[in-house]
Amino acid sequence: MLMTRPNLKGRSFLAEKDFTPEELLYFLDLAAELKEKKKNGIPHHYLEGKNVALLFEKTSTRTRCAFTVACTDLGANPEYLGKGDIQLGKKESVEDTAKVLGRMFDGIEFRGFNHETVESLAQNSGVPVWNGLTDMWHPTQTLADLLTIREHVGKLKNVKLVYVGDGRNNVANSLLVGGAIVGMDVRICTPESLWPAQEVIDLAKKYNEQVMITSNVEEAVASADVIYTDVWVSMGEEEKFAERVELLKPYQVNMKMIKETGNKNVIFLHCLPAFHDVETMYGEEVYEKYGLKEMEVTDEVFRSKHSKVFDQAENRMHTIKAVMAATLGNME
């Protein structure tokens, strides 16, 4: 644990940029502590008697499971509200919905499209709001990524993290800014047409001038400690599939790329789901249409000793638990 525990009670968790390096590192320390307590069967009911609304405008496996189990472990009561249960901006404004939910719940998670929606929930509900994913940021994922990197690399400061693929999506944005805040050497490797927005690059450079944005794979992956990728087409962008496949094929994470790092201990991360084989209906469909058995990562890399993707998935739960405990729980 950090020597000084920051007071985060009542804060919302919307994006990494809202927190200091010390606060982000505190979340990681607390997550590691709670992970150890769960492993050893030590109760940690910091949210005893609290009620938490889980709003899912976008479907999810890991985020929903992580928040649900985290709530239960912390002693809270989770209530799932899917897109058919909520009327955000349709029959009821986000502001009005926020005010109603804030009267009934002690905390609110939101996973959806517009970042403005989660900001409005935070502004109007009067309770902590946690961003489970928006089109702009994915901060709970980044906390899990940072915890996984610290567990396997041993530190975060000056660690070389290379994100390869669609450089404009929420995962890339959060890794770029979140990684820079904690002192990592973050590199985004993607075709120029998919480079992050300049405002995101500028924000990251405020924390770390070492930020690299490049289309050159060899330059990016040299001496990397971490290679990270994500799906080539995000939810809601399916019409861009053929174009993305052609654009990103040279950026597939394969064993050649792993070897080009020159680091035998390099780790591979992916926020999942990953399209590394044809064992899904989606994978079969892609194979029939495009002749691809693997997309953003090869099956060889995904199943190799370098891959830490399931540790990473588990860490979603521990880091989400830390965020909820720190912002809503009684930590005294």
Curated annotation (Swiss-Prot):
GO terms for cellular component: cytoplasm. GO terms for molecular function: amino acid binding; ornithine carbamoyltransferase activity. It is found in: Cytoplasm. Pfam families: OTCace, OTCace_N. PROSITE patterns: CARBAMOYLTRANSFERASE. Its EC number is 2.1.3.3. Its main location: cytoplasm. L-ornithine binds at residues 170, 230, 234-235. Reversibly catalyzes the transfer of the carbamoyl group from carbamoyl phosphate (CP) to the N(epsilon) atom of ornithine (ORN) to produce L-citrulline. This is Ornithine carbamoyltransferase, catabolic. It comes from Bacillus thuringiensis subsp. konkukian (strain 97-27).
